[in-house]
């Protein structure tokens, strides 16, 4: 039996479960900060993780134009090479003058910064916001709400279900 390389989740080590209520509160807190920095012409969600926070932020800021940039970097819980599956539409890019000025990029998490760098290169003047930030990715975002350590794995509510959790004393992480 060959030993496989540990996944990002296993290497991260520190679980950080986030409930729907907590995520919604954090997205509203992000919206409060962003409201002072606008106005913005459109929201661009980095999919898939940025879809839910983008919807909440767009509602809170009264933005009707919502676009996506689709970049794949994780396959389940293992990070791989980045792939642009869909870029920002020409219509949205035009709203930002081609450089992103007045556009708001939203993601759930900035981790290593690889995805952020790629999107930043597409729209260098856009405002980049994330709900959560890790130290390696933090310099790439303009606004975030909560910083977690680099060795933390965030369990987002759309990736989890209700189940029994053993007590910490029994070896639960």
UniProtKB/Swiss-Prot annotation:
Taxonomy, superkingdom: Bacteria
Residues holding Mg(2+): 108
Main location: membrane
Source organism of this protein record: Rhodopseudomonas palustris (strain ATCC BAA-98 / CGA009)
NCBIfam families: PRK09177.1
Pathway terms, separated by semicolons: Purine metabolism; GMP biosynthesis via salvage pathway; GMP from guanine: step 1/1; Purine metabolism; XMP biosynthesis via salvage pathway; XMP from xanthine: step 1/1
Keywords: Cell inner membrane, Cell membrane, Glycosyltransferase, Magnesium, Membrane, Metal-binding, Purine salvage, Transferase
GO biological process: GMP salvage; purine ribonucleoside salvage; XMP salvage
Molecular-function GO term, any one: guanine phosphoribosyltransferase activity
Family note: Belongs to the purine/pyrimidine phosphoribosyltransferase family. XGPT subfamily.
Binding, GMP: 111-115, 153-154
The protein's name: Xanthine-guanine phosphoribosyltransferase
Annotated positions binding guanine: 111, 154
Quaternary state and interactors: Homotetramer.
Glycosyltransferase in keyword set: yes
Residues that bind xanthine: 111, 154
Subcellular location, record wording: Cell inner membrane
Any one annotated GO CC term: plasma membrane
């Amino acid at each position: 039996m060959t030993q496989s390389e540990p996944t990002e989740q296993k290497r991260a080590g520190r679980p950080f479960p986030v409930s729907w209520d907590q995520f919604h509160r954090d997205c509203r807190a992000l919206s409060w900060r962003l409201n002072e920095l606008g106005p913005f012409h459109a929201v661009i969600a980095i999919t898939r993780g940025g879809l839910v926070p983008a919807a909440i932020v767009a509602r809170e800021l009264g933005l009707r134009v919502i676009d996506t940039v689709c970049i794949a970097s994780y396959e389940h819980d293992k990070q791989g090479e980045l792939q642009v599956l869909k870029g920002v539409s020409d219509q949205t890019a035009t709203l930002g003058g081609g450089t992103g000025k007045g556009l708001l990029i939203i993601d759930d998490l900035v981790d290593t910064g690889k995805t952020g760098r790629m999107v930043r290169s597409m729209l260098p003047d856009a405002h980049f916001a994330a709900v959560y930030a890790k130290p390696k990715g933090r310099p790439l975002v303009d606004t975030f709400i909560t910083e977690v350590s680099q060795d933390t794995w965030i369990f987002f509510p759309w990736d989890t279900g209700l189940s029994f959790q053993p007590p910490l004393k029994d070896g639960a992480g």
